[in-house]
């Protein structure tokens, strides 16, 4: 058996960073949607609960339907709770939530990218590229692996394999950062160095060997 290559002292324990987008880099402001829900007598979070039910969200994450068609699915899910007009307003408000990028996270990732490839790996709609452009982040990563473009949704092992291949790095030499425990566990099971993101400090600690 061929021994694993010896790595120089001080070299980082990974050769690529694979990073989620939503709730790591990008954060949404739901206050407008919450106000609409209150105005029509719905409990806060009802629209999101309907929208992100697996059977409703999966088609848009796989790129099989557009965000606008997703709104129609949300309207169907809200039937009986509010009027059709109100349901459409709620669905539209959800897909148009304002968002921002976390400057600290972006800065950390840009610094890391000077040392190793950076790949964004995200469950997203076909709107992702336009959203990254709106945030001024089209050039943030070397590659973007979006579920809607590749037809694979985390935690499917194949999306991690694809991301590592895009980076040109073995799975066990990748750092993976995500805010969803299920995705972190799936990545770890494949041998990736997986980090469950809660705040920017988690990312800074994980990237410390590069910074």
Model region roles, listed by residue range:
Residues 60-103:
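Metal-dependent phosphoesterase signature
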Residues 29, 102, 124-125, 180:
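Helix N-cap/beta->alpha junction signal
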Residues 85-119, 157, 200:
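Short, acidic loop-to-helix structural element flanking the phosphoryl-transfer center
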Residues 2-52:
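Active-site neighborhood of HAD-like aspartate-dependent phosphohydrolases
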Residues 1-15, 19, 125-211:
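Asp-based, Mg2+/Mn2+-dependent phosphohydrolase catalytic module
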Residues 37-75:
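Alpha-helical substrate-recognition element adjacent to the catalytic core
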Residues 40-51, 79-92, 171, 211:
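Short, surface-exposed acidic
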């Amino acid at each position: 058996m061929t021994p694993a290559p010896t790595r120089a002292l001080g070299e980082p324990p990974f050769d690529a960073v694979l990073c989620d987008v939503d709730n790591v880099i990008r954060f949404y402001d739901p206050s407008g949607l919450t106000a609409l829900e209150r105005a029509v007598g719905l409990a806060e979070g009802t629209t999101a609960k309907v929208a992100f039910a697996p059977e409703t969200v999966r088609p848009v994450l796989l790129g099989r339907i557009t965000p606008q068609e997703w709104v129609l699915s949300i309207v169907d899910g809200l039937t009986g709770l509010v009027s059709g007009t109100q349901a459409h307003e709620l669905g539209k408000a959800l897909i148009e939530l304002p968002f921002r990028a976390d400057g600290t996270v972006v800065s950390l990732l840009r610094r890391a990218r000077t040392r190793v490839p950076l790949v964004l790996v995200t469950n997203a709609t076909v709107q992702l590229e336009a959203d990254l452009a709106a945030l001024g982040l089209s050039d943030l990563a070397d590659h973007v692996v979006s579920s809607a473009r590749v037809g694979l949704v985390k935690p499917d092992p194949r999306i991690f394999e694809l991301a590592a291949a895009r980076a040109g790095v073995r799975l066990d030499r990748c750092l993976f950062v995500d805010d969803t425990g299920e995705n972190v566990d799936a990545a770890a099971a494949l041998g990736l160095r997986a980090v469950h993101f809660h705040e920017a400090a988690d990312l800074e600690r994980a990237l410390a060997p590069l910074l």
